[in-house]
Curated annotation (Swiss-Prot):
The keyword Secreted applies. It comes from the Eukaryota. GO terms for cellular component: extracellular space. It comes from Oryctolagus cuniculus (Rabbit). Its main location: secreted. This is Alpha-1-acid glycoprotein.
């Protein structure tokens, strides 16, 4: 089980509608060490909009999700530890996300495919977006992450602005519900195990 990552390499067509001046704010930038520091903590999967049928089905069954990014700067990677509640069951997964610094993308290999997403940092450093298949009308999508379980009105407004720039609308958005999270006990168990390992080392 994994958070929505592209099932194939992202199209290299323009990311968002460049003809709209308001959309100039939503563009990829090179990923720096400061970016990795900003990403290196706990995030909540807050909302998404996908046209790809497989992604759409996946997020519709995702009740709640959160994850941790830990940067390994010298290797240009992020350690991903994710907790997902789907169909009233908690799933845990850990993997490595590779950072393509110059083109502002993140990628993950699942053993079969290399999956790529564009990273969009927002005005609020407590939120960011991943954009998938931007140039493919029937597959494009966007996922929205915040550093708290519930997004602020300002964070949501920026998400909606980016969604419009991608050529999608609010009716396509699927929201998660933190009250349905079942992974918090497992997260606490993992925290205790890490503390014990650290104390013994």
């Amino acid at each position: 089980m994994a958070l929505p990552w592209a099932l194939a390499v992202l199209s290299l067509l323009p990311l968002l509608h460049a003809q709209d001046p308001a959309c100039a704010n939503f563009s990829t930038s090179p990923i720096t060490n400061a970016t990795l520091d900003q990403l290196s903590h706990k995030w909540f999967f807050t909302a998404s909009a996908f046209r790809n049928p497989k992604y759409k089905q996946l997020v519709q069954h995702t009740q709640a999700a959160f994850f941790y990014f830990t940067a390994i700067k010298e290797e240009d990677t992020l350690l991903l530890r994710e907790y997902i509640t789907t169909n009233n069951t908690c799933f845990y997964n850990s993997s490595i996300v590779r950072v393509q610094r110059e083109n502002g993308t993140l990628s993950k290999h699942d053993g079969i495919r290399n999956s790529v997403a564009d990273l969009l940092l927002l005005r609020d450093p407590g939120s960011f977006l991943l954009v998938f298949f931007a140039g493919k009308e029937q597959d494009k999508g966007m996922s929205f992450y915040t550093d708290k379980p519930k997004a602020s009105p300002e964070q949501l407004e920026e998400f909606y602005e980016a969604l419009t720039c991608l050529g999608m609308n609010k009716t396509e958005v699927v929201y998660t519900d933190w009250t349905k999270d079942l992974c918090e006990p497992l997260e606490k168990q993992h925290e205790e195990e890490r503390k014990k390992e650290k104390a013994e080392s």
